[in-house]
Amino acid sequence: MPRFQLVEEPDALVEELRSRGQLAVDTEFMRESTYYAQLCLTQVTAGDTIWCVDPLSGHTQDAFWKEMLSHDWVLHSGRQDIEVIYQLAHAMPASIFDTQVAAGLLGMPAQMGYAGLVKELFDVEIHKMHTRANWSKRPLRDEYLEYAAEDVEYLLPACEELTRQLDSKGRLAWAQEDSRWLLDPDLYTNDNGQTIDRLKGARNFRGRKRAAARRLADWREKEAIKRDRPRQWILRDNVLLDIAWNLPRSEADLGNIQGVPGKLVNRVGHRLLEAVAQSASDTEAYDPPRPPNEEQKALLKEMQSRVAACAESLGIAAETLASKRELSAIIIAGNRKSRVFNGWRAELIGEELRRLL
């Protein structure tokens, strides 16, 4: 088992970190009862001791995060870790190297897990038996801390080995570029205008009813953020859609909709009615995007074929080069800022795809 030290006063670690260089970082968090993920543990190592830093101990941690963010980090599949830390510290680390990204550029599975990577590189078995642990409960059990520490134990050696292999193939800059993309704050910023897209069943709504659903979804999003509670705790999807479909004009109308709880009407009925009423003045087109036509389907198929051929020549998965979702956004939504048209992808496949448009 890895050596670890539980740190209950995060700021006390600052001097120790100050003399270190690159850091391997992982987090444990929970979001079952909150809108924002609750950071429950941060694992950090510079190659010797593994520190398990407890953010729930009640001690200050501003100096800790200021120091942490001044370092270069190594993470594995780090997008969620970065999101949690960005919400907490409102800043990004100096740079990151994502070992999952790097592995994909060497022809390993595009979404290879940490345990799979460690097995592939070092022939070491890591057992993921505590993925569903309650990380917010204190005190943390020793086996939880050992499991958490293991999640960073091999990150720095993995970074070193992946860097060596990438450099030998002339792909190190690719991994650095794709890792840097994960530090774009826009990836972690809420876009309330897109909240309706998260609603299953909203695709069947048109005109005023869709406008009402969007207004209600926007209200729910803001309320969930304000109260730091899951969206479904504020207003369940099916209830939201039922309200939008019926377009109630009074609390009596609202209460008569099957499935709308009376306590919901009493608590926020006026807010729901206000959102529905505001939708009457919406002039923007709220109809859902049209499904791709035959010409667009043919173009997507051709693009996928060319991406697959290029990816095969590189020995990497097609989705590592350009996913179906990215290609669809280019064709249907007109996304000309896609990473497919930028950086290392532009020369390999982006310009070829652009000529098809």
Which residues does each PLM region occupy?
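A generic local structural motif
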Residues: 9-12, 59-63
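Flexible, charged surface loops at secondary-structure boundaries
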Residues: 16-19, 66-70
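Active-site-proximal helix-loop-helix substrate-binding element of RNase H-like nuclease domains
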Residues: 3, 43, 48-61, 67, ...
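An N-terminal structural lobe/cap that precedes and organizes the functional/catalytic core
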Residues: 28-45, 50
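N-terminal accessory regions of nucleic-acid-interacting proteins
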Residues: 1-23, 27
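Accessory DNA-binding and partner-docking regions appended to nucleic-acid-acting proteins
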Residues: 142, 162-357
